[in-house]
Swiss-Prot record:
This is Small ribosomal subunit protein bS6. It comes from the Bacteria. Binds together with bS18 to 16S ribosomal RNA. PANTHER family: MITOCHONDRIAL 28S RIBOSOMAL PROTEIN S6, SMALL RIBOSOMAL SUBUNIT PROTEIN BS6M. GO terms for biological process: translation. Keywords: Ribonucleoprotein, Ribosomal protein, RNA-binding, rRNA-binding. The gene is rpsF.
C-alpha cells in the first residue's frame, strides 16, 4: 500500500547552484529508482536558519513530496546522513487528505522557486482621507463633538502612617 511522504532537507549555504542542482537530482533519482511515485520537488532557495547548525547561519531548503511503500525512507535518510552537503533533514508521513498531487509531472531540475513577498507595513491608525473640497472640510469641523467632561474630581485621601507600633504596657506584677 502506498503512503504519502514529505521530506524537507537543508543543504550547505556554500554550495554553488550547480552543486545544489546535482544534490536535488541525486535524491530525486534515488526515489524514482526505488519505486517512489509522483515525486514532486519544491526548491525554497537560500534562507536564514532559525538557529545555527554546524556553525552555519543559512542553507538551501528543498521539499520533496512522494508516494511510496516506506522502504525508501531508511536508505534515503542514510544517504543524507552520510552526505557532507546535507546539514539537516526531516521526513514525515502525510495523511490522505494532506497530499494533493499535481495533474502533470514536474519538469526536470529545480522547480517552484517562490518569490519573496514583501508587503509594506500597515499603519497602526488609518489616517483620515483628505477632503475633496473646502465646503466638506467646513462641515466636518462643525460636526466634531467637543471632548467629554472628565468625571467628578476625586477628593483628597488622608494618608495614615502605620509604621508606628503601638505597645501597651504589660503588668509584670501578677497577683495569684
Amino acid at each position: 500500500m502506498t503512503k504519502s511522504y514529505e521530506m524537507v532537507y537543508i543543504l550547505r549555504p556554500d554550495l554553488l547552484e550547480e552543486q545544489v542542482q546535482q544534490e536535488i537530482n541525486r535524491y530525486r533519482d534515488f526515489l524514482t529508482e526505488n519505486e517512489a511515485q509522483e515525486v514532486q520537488i519544491k526548491y525554497w532557495g537560500k534562507r536564514r536558519l532559525a538557529y545555527p547548525i554546524k556553525k552555519l547561519q543559512d542553507g538551501f531548503y528543498v521539499q520533496m513530496n512522494y508516494q511510496g511503500d516506506g522502504k525508501q525512507i531508511a536508505p534515503l535518510e542514510r544517504m543524507m546522513r552520510l552526505s557532507d552537503e546535507v546539514i539537516r533533514y526531516l521526513t514525515i508521513k502525510l495523511d490522505k487528505d494532506q497530499y494533493t498531487p499535481n495533474d502533470s509531472p514536474p519538469p526536470e531540475g529545480i522547480i517552484d522557486t517562490p518569490k519573496p513577498v514583501i508587503e509594506p507595513p500597515k499603519p497602526a491608525v488609518e489616517s483620515p482621507k483628505p477632503a475633496e473640497t473646502t465646503e466638506e472640510t467646513a462641515e466636518a469641523v462643525e460636526t466634531v463633538e467637543p471632548p467629554a467632561e472628565p468625571a467628578e474630581p476625586v477628593e483628597a485621601v488622608e494618608t495614615v502612617d502605620t509604621t508606628e507600633e503601638t505597645v501597651e504596657p504589660v503588668d509584670t506584677t501578677s497577683e495569684e
